Every structure is written in C-alpha cells, then in structure tokens.
C-alpha cells in the first residue's frame, strides 16, 4: 500500500512538472528573435546587390517567363507572410531561376534569391518548393549573413564569406549538372 501511495505521489509530481514545463519549452523553441547585428540594413542591401551581380555572371539564369513568374508568385506570397517585426521594407526580394539541375536554392542579403531548375523539377508539389524558399527567405529577413559577421569580424570578411558561399553553390551546380 505504501509503494502504491509513493508511486501515485511521484506520478502526480511528474505530471505537475510536465504541465508546467512543456508549455515553457514549446514557447522557447518556437519564439524567433532577431539576432544581434552591428550592421545597418543598407549594408545587407549593398552586400546582396554586389553578390547578385557576381551570381548572374557565374550562373546561367534561365529565361523561362512562365517558370520565373511561378517562382516570383510563390516568393511574393512567402514575403507577405514574413512577421511584421522582421519585415524590412527596403529589402528588394527578387526571384530568379538558375538553369542548373541540382536541387538547390539560395538567397543573398537584402533579398535577391535564386531557385535552381532542378528544385522545381524535383518538388512533388508547390509546398515542397515553398518550404525551401521560405527557409532561404528567413535567412534574409533575420539578416543572418551580417548577424553572423557581427559574431566573426569585418564587413570585408563578410563579402569574402559570400564569395565562398557562391563558390560552394557553383561547385554544387557543377556536380548536379
């Protein structure tokens, strides 16, 4: 009888603990905050614009009006879903289609985004593609590139880091072509 009573008390204590802690843990996991960033929004725009110029020199941009309109339409819907506290009205979200067969997409600071043809072809539905695009848009909205640089060093290093990202994307594109 004593064991049953102790077992019940432990069960009640465990349940009380779970009832109190689980909601707190859930909130902590779903609460998104803007990372620390010493750079101005204009820095993101400048870096992204410079990187976009390089991307468009090195990647084959696909001139398919229907496919481009499609990713622009999906992208525009995703951008309107960005929570107000993370919206930067000066960001220019632009969506271009890269003629590469690998399943990939990437976004640059300030809004330029590139979706590979292979991702559209591999997606079983619009939701799969939109999920990848939303992930990339979140990097832009939360200003991850300059926030990461705030942790690591100078703006010049940031431009170098974007060069490395683009180099990796080029290699991935060659591997998937």
Feature map (PLM): residue ranges:
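N-terminal secretory signal peptides that target proteins for export/translocation
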Residues: 1-8
């Amino acid at each position: 009888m004593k064991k049953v009573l102790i077992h019940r008390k432990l069960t009640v204590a465990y349940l009380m603990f779970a009832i109190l802690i689980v909601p707190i843990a859930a909130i902590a996991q779903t609460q998104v905050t803007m990372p620390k960033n010493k750079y101005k929004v204009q820095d993101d725009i400048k870096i992204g614009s410079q990187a976009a110029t390089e991307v468009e020199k090195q990647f084959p941009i696909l001139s398919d009006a229907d496919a481009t309109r499609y990713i622009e339409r999906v992208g525009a819907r995703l951008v309107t879903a960005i929570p107000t506290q993370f919206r930067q009205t000066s960001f220019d979200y632009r969506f271009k289609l890269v003629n590469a067969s690998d399943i990939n997409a990437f976004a640059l600071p300030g809004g330029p985004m590139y979706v590979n043809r292979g991702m559209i072809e591999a997606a079983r539905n619009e939701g799969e593609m939109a999920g990848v695009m939303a992930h990339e848009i979140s990097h832009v909205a939360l200003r991850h590139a300059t926030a990461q640089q705030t942790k690591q060093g100078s703006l010049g290093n940031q431009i170098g880091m974007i060069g490395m990202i683009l180099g990796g994307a080029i290699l991935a594109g060659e591997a998937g072509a």
